Amino acid sequence: MFRWWKTAAPVAAGQPPAPADAPDDLLLAQLRIFATAPSLSVVDAGAHHGQTAEQYLTHFPGSRVIALEPDPENFGIAQQTLAPFGDRVALLPLALAETDGSVSLRRTSHSGAHSLLEVGDMRYYDAPVETLAPVEVRAVSLDSLCAGHGLDRLDILKMDIQGAELLALRGAADLLARQAIGLIALEVLFQPLYRDQPTFWDIADHLRARGYALQGLHDQRQHAVNHAVLRWADAVFVAPRLQALS
């Protein structure tokens, strides 16, 4: 889970979150890779309360961000967080998926653990997680989203969508075939938090087959009790056009 928002102060009902932490290792890696870029196009899928999009908009001043957050409560908080950035950000109430259409968002008692997948073995989570009633939300594929916004290429794709990352990558078949996404920063899971959930190895195989290389694993989290077991991390993959620069 992206530390940029996981470590933010608790949010009171109806109030925007406190500003996120200073750049961590994951963001610094991206800042180094794009140090000379005058402007960036970014898609933030799983925007939660808007903290990650806020970091991109703050630390990449020339960037424009499309942020997706399907949960209505999270979306409302993200609106407040991102309001100061005006038309540099488009916040949309959408889930990123393999195809366009309506999908069921499985909600939980932890606002950062909602998923398109059913809850699995939550023993690997930090605290007890209860399943709530699902809600129907609209979904879009990345290929469709970018085409609709006139984006032929994308500099950064960030995803924190709780086990549905491989589904979303399958919905980016055209972009990935053209290696048109420069950098992909995403949460990767090593343990089955959700049913039928792909792991890091599935995602790495999918991206490696399309020419992407692993830049690194950041913010690795071990099991709270058995520290020998890796639960999740944030991974960065880069397209061939960036591999000589990273």
Residue ranges with predicted function:
Residues 1-246:
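Phosphate/nucleotide-binding beta-alpha loop and adjacent structural elements of enzyme active sites
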